[in-house]
Amino acid sequence: MNLALHTLSLAGSETLNDGFAATLLAGGCQLVDVRSPDDFMRDALPGALNLPVEVLSYDFRHLDKHEPVIVYGAHPVACVRAARLLAGQGFSRIYHLAFLRM
């Protein structure tokens, strides 16, 4: 599985360089898995929090607004929706992770 990290903006997303993505994934970020609890239990990324979009819309207290957040899940639309919810709550460094299957 290949990974691509994108930054969210209202205009779209931008692919980040591999070095920056590696730095974030190595521990300088908060990982939010927006999939169902069952999917999360099956194969979550290490250190990720399970906050499905339905939960994230009212409960984001486990996240620090001052730290970068990477949102990932099975569906890009859910990731973008979650990222926009976080942006609306004052989070500014929000990224979404795209899983590219080859």
Task: Name each model-derived stretch.
Residues 51-52:
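Short acidic-hydrophobic, aromatic-tinged amphipathic segments that line or gate anion-handling sites
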Residues 1-42:
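Flexible, polar/low-complexity N-terminal or interdomain linker segments that lie immediately upstream
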Residues 32-33, 48, 86:
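Conserved small-residue
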Residues 60-102:
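Catalytic cysteine-centered active loop of the rhodanese-like fold, especially the PTP/DSP P-loop
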Residues 55-58:
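Alpha-helical scaffolding within the catalytic cores
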Residues 40-46, 60-63:
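Short loop/helix-cap segments at secondary-structure boundaries that form the rim of catalytic
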Residues 29, 48, 94:
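Short, conserved active-site loop motifs that form the nucleotide-linked donor/cofactor pocket
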